């Protein structure tokens, strides 16, 4: 590994590490009250204690389950609707306007109605996460299919491709970059929605951990929960980027990026 490549790998971490160092220094020097924002070392100690007791693992597992199930349901529906409206003119006429109207309703504003529908159990939280992840994947799937080069489609048809073979070998690969962008957006909305969803009478989860800590003025635990959401969001984005690297190796833009690295 050359010095330049090492620098490229470390560059994204320079600003976060500098901010943490400045944060710790401000608390140690008394420039920042621990009642407002505890030191990173105090947040780390709180996390270590929760890990040791096993409580943090429980909250992480439950939040991860809610996020994963909601993403699978919402993403699956969004992908299916995107395929229908992207591949079929009649599908677009029948579905797109209705989907767009629903998309423009803030899904977090539906919380009172969701509680009436599902109560306060897991179904309400999963429904909100699914609703938050559906539309980014739908829009990018639809956009990706509609922007496949028509000349490529006609060329494939001239070689005898049609039906599912045409979809699998030409349309889907052409739409895949846009679909994966939708996945990255959806993963961000997934954690954003979950933060609010876990305030609905939850008894476990990272959101519950933060709300419970607030009641007891445990600022270090509240900050820990916020940082956990940020870390989980970053890990999810890294996973999506890993899918891009694995599935888009053939794409000229990604080949050029890999060559530059």
Question: Model regions: which residues?
Answer:
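N-terminal signal-anchor/first transmembrane alpha helix
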Residues: 1-27
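Glycine-rich helix-loop "coupling/hinge" segments at transmembrane-helix boundaries
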Residues: 115-116, 145, 192-229, 248-258
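Short cytoplasmic-facing helical segments at TM-TM junctions of multi-pass membrane proteins
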Residues: 97, 140, 144-182, 210
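C-terminal transmembrane helix and the adjacent membrane-cytosol boundary/short C-terminal tail
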Residues: 89, 146, 177-181, 224-261
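Periplasmic/extracellular loop-to-transmembrane helix junction in inner-membrane transport proteins
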Residues: 3-5, 29-73
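Generic hydrophobic transmembrane alpha-helix motif, especially the helices
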Residues: 100-136, 143-144
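Transmembrane alpha-helices
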Residues: 127, 131, 164-196, 220-223, ...
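Transmembrane-helix boundary motif in ABC transporter permease subunits
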Residues: 69-99
């Amino acid at each position: 590994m050359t010095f330049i490549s090492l620098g490229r790998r470390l560059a994204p971490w320079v600003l976060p590490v500098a901010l943490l160092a400045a944060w710790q220094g401000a608390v140690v020097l008394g420039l920042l009250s621990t009642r407002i924002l505890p030191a990173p070392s105090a947040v780390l100690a709180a996390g270590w204690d929760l890990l040791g007791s096993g409580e943090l693992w429980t909250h992480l597992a439950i939040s991860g389950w809610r996020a994963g199930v909601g993403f699978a349901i919402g993403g699956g529906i969004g992908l299916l609707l995107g395929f229908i409206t992207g591949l079929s003119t009649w599908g677009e006429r029948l579905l797109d306007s209705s989907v767009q109207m629903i998309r423009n309703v803030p899904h977090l504003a539906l919380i009172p109605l969701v509680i009436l529908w599902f109560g306060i159990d897991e179904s309400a939280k999963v429904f909100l996460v699914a609703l938050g992840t559906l539309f980014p994947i739908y829009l990018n799937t639809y956009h990706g299919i509609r922007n496949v080069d028509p000349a490529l489609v006609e060329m494939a048809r001239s070689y005898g491709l049609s039906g599912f073979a045409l979809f699998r070998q030409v349309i889907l690969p052409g739409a895949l970059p846009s679909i994966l962008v939708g996945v990255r957006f959806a993963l961000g909305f997934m954690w954003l929605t979950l933060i609010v969803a876990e305030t609905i009478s939850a008894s476990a989860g990272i959101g519950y951990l933060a709300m419970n800590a607030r009641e007891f003025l445990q600022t270090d635990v509240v900050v820990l929960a916020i940082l956990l959401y940020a870390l989980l969001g970053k890990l999810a984005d890294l996973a999506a980027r890993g899918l891009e690297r694995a599935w888009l190796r053939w794409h000229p833009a990604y080949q050029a990026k890999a060559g530059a690295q």
